[in-house]
Amino acid sequence: KDSKEILRRLALSKELYDYHAPIENELANIYDIERLTRRIKLNRLHPFELNYLYDSLLSIKEVVTFMENYKFITPPCSSTDLTLFIQSIDSTFDLSISGKYMLKDVEVNMISEGINTQIDELNTQNDILYSKLELLRNHILSYVKSDDVNYVGINRLDKEGFFLTLTKNRFNLIKQEIMTSHLIVDDELYLFKDFTIKIQTNSVKIFCKLTEDISDKYVHNLRKIIELNKLVFKEKIAEFEKKFAILLEELVQFIAEVDLTVSNIKTAKKYNYSCPKIVKTKENENFIELIDLRHPIIEANEEQGIYVPNDIILGELSLASKEYKDNVIIKNSNPINMNNNKMHGVLLYGINSS
């Protein structure tokens, strides 16, 4: 019934017909933002979904910029508004980390520096602890006689905590010399002969009182960091909801219209479709005339033979085109009362075959 809306959409497809290529790839990179918007409203968004939102906003920004330049559709916001949203996400979270986790599975810090002072303090403490392990690594490297930090690794396992590791061959080369060595960390003397050395098939693990103490403190801080990360993530998503919820809802409608228009254009080009003509009828009249009607999905899946299109004429038959006035369906549908010349339905036998 809403002919104006249909005509508007058809006109938009005609306008974009030769210009949709630049935004087609961007549309393919946009996630289901309607679903993401619902999850933001419920504050049930996961960190990895935040990455989906971020990537989607980058592509949406390109679509909005395109529309700002060429005026096909008026976007609900400016590219500057989207830049603000994008920067809000980028400055708050480390997206290289958040993209790996559901909220319950977060195991490292993903909050950017300057967002939460408690997290920053705990991260600073852990950086100091880790630097002590690097002193130990540098001590071993001095005997390996190499500046390549990859020769000696610093690893951590849940059960064993922190330990240093190097190949069995390298350790055997320095074993005699390094076992008589020592180092001082925070005014405390550590004798290498007191270290625990675990020799494995191809590598050696090195533990000591220093690595044990650091492991305990580091893990204790990390647990606090993870819990604070979950709280801050929830708080920030709630802030985004208050600030950008309306914008997201408007973008959902905007992208849906652009996506539908591009889909119409691609289908029309592929199957050589043409626009329908809307016939003006009275309030109590309905009419539809479909000649050589084709179904894009069925036609695309046709594997054998030739797709057979259909002709359908329904409603007020007096409105039928002149060339179809002699159509057998129209002739046989005429009732005794010529004032009520309507076709209310078609009974189809069989299926579309070739």
Describe every region a protein language model picked out.
Residues 1-353:
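Alpha-helical coupling/stalk and coiled-coil linker elements that connect catalytic or binding modules
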